[in-house]
Amino acid sequence: MNYLKIVDDDLLNAKEDYIAHQCNCISTNAKALAKQLFDNYDYADSYKKRIRQNKNTYSKPSTIEIFGNGDTQRYIINMYSQYYPAEAKYSNDTTDQRLQWFQECLKHISKIPDIKTKTIAMPFNIGCGAAGGDWGVYSKLLT
């Protein structure tokens, strides 16, 4: 059974219980979609906790962070499935690694208590816009 439904709308208008999006692990300032989300849900801005050039403050690839309480704060899932921003170009952040990290993030999401009774909105082409992934491959992981 396919649970993927593509909706042509602004992600910020989504009515789903969770919004999940792909993040990189090192940026200290959000751009593009992450900036839009963090501007609207500042409690989910993991980038502002980071210190430039301090690896101890970076996120770890293949992990997720969940922000919000589902009541007064909408749930936001930050999926750390790329190490650097933009397209993959370094040996420690390859296209294959990003795909693997994305899969691992999906596994973490599947283990959220009561997730089977919840809905999740993700941006169309997640992992494939500025990150440069192949939607034909990524979309299959979501179905």
Identify the function of each model-found stretch.
Residues M1-T143:
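Macrodomain-like recognition of ADP-ribose-binding/processing modules
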